[in-house]
Amino acid sequence: RQLELHRGLNNYTQNSVRDAVKDIVGIQFRNLATVGGSIWGRFGFSDVLTVFLAMDTYVELYQGGRIPLREFVGQKPDQDILVRLVIKKTSGCFSYASVRNQSTDFPVIACAASVVGGEYRLSVGARPGRAMLLLDEEGLLSEGLTEDSIENFAMWAEKHIPTGSNHRAGAKYRSRLVRVLSQRLLNKLREEQKWR
């Protein structure tokens, strides 16, 4: 709940963090849930992990020290202790969206897009596997966000984000949602950049 109401964090992320947690079950549950539990568990359905993965974020481990969240997500669970989550205040634009079968259900797919320090990032969770980060390795957005570059990146993301099926949705549907949501989020980033 603190994430949802934190004015500084939401100003920094253009309300992306608020958007990521507002549909999590209910206020009572959000009051009890912890950021550390969501990050440490690396749950596939985690809205929190998805949104923080798109940022310049690090985890500090008791024994392992400070490592980028993108590395931590790929590691196997161990007995180390998560001490803190560190969000670098690198200048950027952020956006988040998810699709749910019901408003308080786990997401069918969750996406966060960002441009941080000139690097475009797309984080996709509820694939139904762990959230993963896709960077613009092909340079499709290197000339900036235009209608064509956004559409090309969205099609590329659809092909490069592996999805699976479960009782919430099929893999093909999820892949299509990756394309649609990444387009929407990048268009939102483009609008945000116009105002800066």
Q: What label would you give each PLM region?
A:
Residues 1-196:
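C-terminal structural segment of proteins
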